[in-house]
């Protein structure tokens, strides 16, 4: 990249606390998804925010279709950011695909992470004989076809489903960041995410994990949270949130912030 990775991915460090908290956004959003969560943590933490390279807030020229074919290059980006900032230990909050990025990063560099908080995490979206991920292959292919055929129509249908709760402002916000993404990048990343299978590495995670599972998440059924609890290698806790949908930081930020503070203070 012509400019540094920190500039390219819009890395920011805000807050005045001694402890470091990383907030990593998920698919279809950017770091602005944390805006209503952020005020709850600025006094007690130095908060690191950044955009995934696929986010609409990042220059699409930085997205290398030959490189970002798995989640590993996203892990490289995260670890590069932490090293460049001189961070030797942090608590990490990852939503959606960033939950899995955090899991992979903690396997590579466990000393960097005091705990992982995983929101809407899924190691695999496709169903198997002994695993309910929530989607059949045919359903996923229909999603890809809909994205290719008419991106605007797909966003207008997908955003309310993902938000789940009847919170029009959250639907508008998620739609905005989806529309900011270049459609070919959205489709490419969707294929990467939906076709990934991280179940085999879960046992390698030794960092304590807090699994946040909302009610009626269109993308991640409750059984996935139970699967994570049973297969992650370290100490872990499931937090069943009385919030609907896949994006609680948009639809119920105050409630989520309270749950995050509780998990962060848990020893």
Swiss-Prot record:
Q: Which keywords has UniProt assigned to this entry?
A: Hydrolase
One BP annotation, GO: secondary shoot formation
Active-site residue list:
96, 217, 246
Has keyword Hydrolase? yes
Q: Does the record's keyword annotation contain GTP-binding?
A: no
Q: List the EC numbers from the record.
A: 3.1.-.-
The knockout note for this entry states: Increased shoot branching.
* Pfam families (UniProt xref): Abhydrolase_6 (PF12697)
Swapping residue 96 to A leads to an effect described as: Loss of activity and abolish interaction with MAX2A
Q: Which GO terms describe its molecular function?
A: hydrolase activity, acting on ester bonds
Q: Which family does it belong to?
A: Belongs to the AB hydrolase superfamily.
Function of the protein: Involved in strigolactone signaling pathway. May function downstream of strigolactone synthesis, as a component of hormone signaling or as an enzyme that participates in the conversion of strigolactones to the bioactive form. Can hydrolyze the synthetic strigolactone analog GR24 in vitro.
Subunit notes for this chain?
Interacts with MAX2A in a strigolactone-dependent manner.
Protein known as: Probable strigolactone esterase DAD2
Gene (name only): DAD2
């Amino acid at each position: 990249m012509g400019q540094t990775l920190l500039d390219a991915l819009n890395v920011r460090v805000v807050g005045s606390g001694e402890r470091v908290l990383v907030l990593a956004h998920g698919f279809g959003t950017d770091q602005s998804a944390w805006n209503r969560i952020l005020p709850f943590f600025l006094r007690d933490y130095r908060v690191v925010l950044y955009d995934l390279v696929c986010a609409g807030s990042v220059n699409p020229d930085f997205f290398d279709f030959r490189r970002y074919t798995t989640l590993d290059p996203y892990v490289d980006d995260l670890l590069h950011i932490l090293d460049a900032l001189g961070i030797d230990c942090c608590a990490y909050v990852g939503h959606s695909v960033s939950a899995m990025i955090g899991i992979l990063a903690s396997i590579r560099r466990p000393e960097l992470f005091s705990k992982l908080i995983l929101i809407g995490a899924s190691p695999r979206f496709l169903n198997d004989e002994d695993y309910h991920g929530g989607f059949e292959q045919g359903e996923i292919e229909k999603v890809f076809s809909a994205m290719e055929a008419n991106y605007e129509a797909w966003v207008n249908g997908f955003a309310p489903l993902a938000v789940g709760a009847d919170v029009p402002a959250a639907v508008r916000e998620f739609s905005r960041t989806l529309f900011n993404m270049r459609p070919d990048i959205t489709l490419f990343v969707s294929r990467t995410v939906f076709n990934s299978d991280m179940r085999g590495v879960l046992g390698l995670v030794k960092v304590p994990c807090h699994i946040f599972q909302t009610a009626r998440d269109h993308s991640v059924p409750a059984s996935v949270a139970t699967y994570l609890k049973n297969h992650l290698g370290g100490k872990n806790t499931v937090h069943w949130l009385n919030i609907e949908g896949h994006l609680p930081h948009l639809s119920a930020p105050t409630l989520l912030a309270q749950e995050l503070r509780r998990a962060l203070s848990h020893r």
